[in-house]
């Protein structure tokens, strides 16, 4: 088991625990706790690690959990339970759960102590870390949200080991993202260790999760609130990926949409002359290596192009008709590029037809 702390803000450190018994950290929390957990989580697996007063609240999974009206229902739980700013909110579940629970923890009384316990690979390496919380509104994903850092991130690998391999694969797109634009060593590890990663070897999973968390937190530490143009690197694949999700009515798993989004955006970078020769091929190869989709033809749902382009035009990163995008220049490196939204829509239309 690996445990370390990162100082993201001057107010507090974030404890990070990765390993097969990471849940034991919860025994250190003696304060009153509201535990919001995915209905797919076996709560009996969690209870032995809980001490002191706590309230268990099963919640919805997936995009249903991220509806703004549902967030109001969860806030009422905190209000009715008499929770105050000295108490804790614990989110146990996938990315949609940590997104939603992080949002309510940050807004109730302007902030309660938050602990994220992601139970999927996607949650452990992306959605459950970094402090961005969001819910959906008006057909647009994550358009209402906050920046709010958790007190701790607990990545207990036993959750992953018990998941079907396909669920682990869905989260690998985000891991591969770090390798493509931030961390060549991680890319090389993934290239050489496919079998151990997909077979959920604990040592390989521990390395992949720890490395991904450190990659993301290093970016967040430098640009927590997206004011310096650094954190945008974490959006690689997400501009087109979110459009794909919207165009499918959010029926396509996030990881698969991001996988196709990374291929599209790597191609755009190449066509605009920002990436070295071979970057597109290396992107396609590593995603195919892990049996992730590389084109919309490989996705399970049809994409409504009009809806996808509408979502693209409503992207939060658009300023004065221009979108700031992270383009891979070589494996493990990237460049910030301003792309006119109409130009991007033209490229996206080619990619999504």
Swiss-Prot record:
Binds 1 divalent metal cation per subunit. Can use either Co(2+) or Zn(2+). It catalyses: 7-phospho-2-dehydro-3-deoxy-D-arabino-heptonate = 3-dehydroquinate + phosphate. One of its GO terms (biological process) is aromatic amino acid family biosynthetic process. It is an enzyme of class 4 (lyase). CDD domains: DHQS. Its EC number is 4.2.3.4. PANTHER family: 3-DEHYDROQUINATE SYNTHASE (PTHR43622:SF1). This is 3-dehydroquinate synthase. It comes from Sulfolobus acidocaldarius (strain ATCC 33909 / DSM 639 / JCM 8929 / NBRC 15157 / NCIMB 11770).
